[in-house]
């Protein structure tokens, strides 16, 4: 009903606009077209792009008569992955009145680039500058594309350097790769070994470059030194291809000598940047452009699946996931994991765990990375015995010097702790600290476990103080150190910490319970009962805790 009202108001406002008299409107427009157009806008604003597209298509009569129609229609087409259709619509319907948006000229520039008509591409790009409107990222896109066009036309890198930090450096690496510049290796190495950011993704493209130039042994030497457990999906897949002696797989999906391939990677970078800022709509827009330029690189669609998942659009997530099959082990496993997450949201955690465990057992000789994932799935589902079984497999397959050795011990040790096997738990956690003595979360977990058992309280407090010095904004560590002070009867200090933990994690039942206990000890009993009562309302409160809280609400702390 509300949507109908808005549609009526919008139509009324449009009819009364000084730009169009009622007579002019009746001559050139149809109220049905207007209704569909505004319905399209509403659907678009609600992120229902498929529905928006239907409405826009049914109101195409307005395409040359309403300034923003073409812009909304084009944006929706691209969001639906129909980039070529968007380009066609722009070509057929662009006028001086409806062409005042950056993306129209960008798409035309890219279409000309695809056809290697670089002069025409530059003309469209030049026009796009008129509509940047102080949007810094649009300016970066235009300037970077301008530099790529210079490389493609002149076969040399522009002497005019743009100062966009590592963004510019990444693109220069690809430009040098395209030119097969003698310093390409140096540039790739400088990029992937950067101390400031994680640019491990570009190892994949360096491997691609080496294989293209017949340097397979060097590529293999690089992947031999990569750890599956510590590598991204893309790097893991590349490592597997080399182990399986399938270097041709690299060439099938990307080539530095192909202009559209490297520009496609640039737009993936833009998309990834938007996604990291939770701007999923713009991320999807540029990701679809990236995929249009290089549809062979289907692995980039994993970001599109993640974006849809975060927006709770599970239907589109599942559709994208069908792009991945068993031939590419790691992306197939990504598909199964994401499906399991969707099942968890829609059908519950038990069905999700059944699904992932069943499909895991169908995989022959799963990678250690996949074993690690299935262990974590079971641990998170509180199936600790199953999790320990998988952690045992991992520990038997990795060297003690592996960067993740301490992490696996921590995960196995915490699983033992949840089962009440404190001997094995303490052994694993202490050994993990031998490997990484400054790992705050392990210090916190072991110390808190000891506090719960009222064991080595003084040492626990020292460990927690060390953990807090390393991560003083972590709510779990703040709660633990506060609870340690509670156990040694320093309630003032305890309250200072736990109060902050409650502020950081207001929905956590344990933190609220702890705060209630401390307030009771400080003789602030009405407040204590308030926080205990709050625990009963929280979604994550377990049954045993509810029973304990109900007793506290009746009797208070019986040892007070």
Regions found by a protein language model. Give the residues of each.
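Residue-level recognition of tetratricopeptide repeat
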Residues: 41, 75, 110, 148, ...
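Structural motif corresponding to the intra-repeat A-B loop/turn of tetratricopeptide repeats
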Residues: 46, 80, 115, 151-153, ...
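Alpha-helical repeat scaffolds
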Residues: 53, 57, 83-96, 119-131, ...
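Short coil turns that delineate tetratricopeptide repeat
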Residues: 64, 98-99, 133, 196-197, ...
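TPR alpha-solenoid repeat register
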Residues: 69, 104, 138, 168, ...
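Terminal, low-structured helical/coil segments at or just beyond the last alpha-helical repeat
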Residues: 254-264, 509, 514, 521-560
């Amino acid at each position: 009903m509300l949507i109908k009202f808005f549609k009526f108001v919008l139509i009324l406002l449009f009819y009364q606009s000084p730009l169009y008299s009622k007579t002019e409107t009746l001559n050139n427009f149809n109220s049905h077209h207007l209704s569909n157009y505004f319905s399209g806008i509403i659907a678009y604003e609600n992120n229902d792009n498929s529905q928006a597209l239907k409405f826009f298509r049914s109101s195409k009569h307005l395409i040359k008569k309403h300034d923003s129609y073409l812009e909304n229609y084009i944006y929706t087409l691209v969001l639906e992955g129909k980039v070529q259709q968007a380009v066609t619509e722009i070509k057929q319907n662009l006028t001086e009145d409806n062409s005042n948006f950056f993306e129209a000229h960008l798409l035309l520039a890219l279409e000309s680039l695809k056809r290697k008509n670089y002069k025409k591409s530059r003309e469209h790009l030049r026009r796009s500058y008129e509509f940047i409107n102080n949007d810094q990222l649009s300016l970066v896109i235009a300037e970077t594309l301008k530099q790529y066009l210079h490389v493609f036309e002149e076969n040399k890198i522009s002497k005019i350097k743009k100062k966009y930090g590592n963004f510019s450096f990444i693109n220069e690496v690809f430009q040098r790769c395209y030119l097969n510049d003698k310093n390409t290796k140096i540039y790739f190495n400088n990029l992937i070994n950067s101390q400031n950011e994680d640019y491990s993704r570009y190892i994949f493209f360096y491997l691609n470059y080496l294989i293209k130039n017949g340097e397979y042994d060097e590529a293999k030497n690089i992947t031999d030194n990569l750890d599956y457990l510590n590598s991204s999906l893309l790097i893991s897949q590349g490592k597997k291809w080399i182990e399986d002696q399938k270097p041709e797989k690299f060439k099938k999906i990307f080539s530095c000598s192909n202009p559209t391939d490297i520009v496609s990677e640039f737009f993936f970078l833009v998309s990834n940047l938007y996604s990291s800022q939770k701007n999923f709509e713009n991320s999807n827009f540029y990701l679809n452009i990236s995929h249009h330029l290089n549809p062979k690189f289907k692995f980039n669609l994993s970001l599109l699946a993640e974006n849809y998942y975060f927006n709770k659009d599970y239907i589109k997530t599942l559709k994208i996931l069908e792009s991945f099959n068993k031939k590419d082990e790691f992306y197939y496993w990504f598909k199964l994991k994401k499906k399991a997450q969707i099942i968890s949201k829609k059908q519950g955690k038990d069905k999700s765990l059944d699904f992932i465990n069943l499909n895991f057992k169908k995989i022959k000789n799963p990678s250690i990375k996949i074993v690690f994932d299935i262990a974590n799935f079971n641990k998170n589902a509180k199936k600790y015995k199953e999790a320990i079984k998988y952690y045992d497999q991992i520990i038997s397959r990795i060297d003690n010097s592996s960067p993740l050795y301490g992490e696996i011990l921590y995960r196995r040790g915490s699983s033992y702790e949840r089962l009440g096997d404190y001997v094995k738990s303490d052994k694993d956690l202490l050994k993990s600290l031998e490997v990484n003595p400054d790992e705050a979360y392990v210090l916190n977990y072991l110390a808190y476990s000891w506090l719960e058992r009222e064991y080595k309280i003084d040492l626990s407090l020292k460990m927690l103080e060390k953990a807090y010095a390393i991560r003083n904004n972590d709510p779990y560590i703040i709660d633990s150190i506060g609870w340690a002070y509670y156990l040694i009867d320093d309630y003032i200090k305890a309250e200072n910490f736990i109060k902050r933990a409650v502020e950081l994690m207001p929905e956590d039942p344990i933190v609220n319970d702890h705060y209630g206990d401390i307030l009771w000890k400080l003789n602030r009993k009405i407040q204590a009962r308030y926080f205990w009562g709050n625990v009963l309302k929280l979604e994550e409160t377990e049954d045993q805790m509810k029973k304990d809280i109900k007793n506290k609400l009746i009797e208070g702390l019986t040892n007070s």
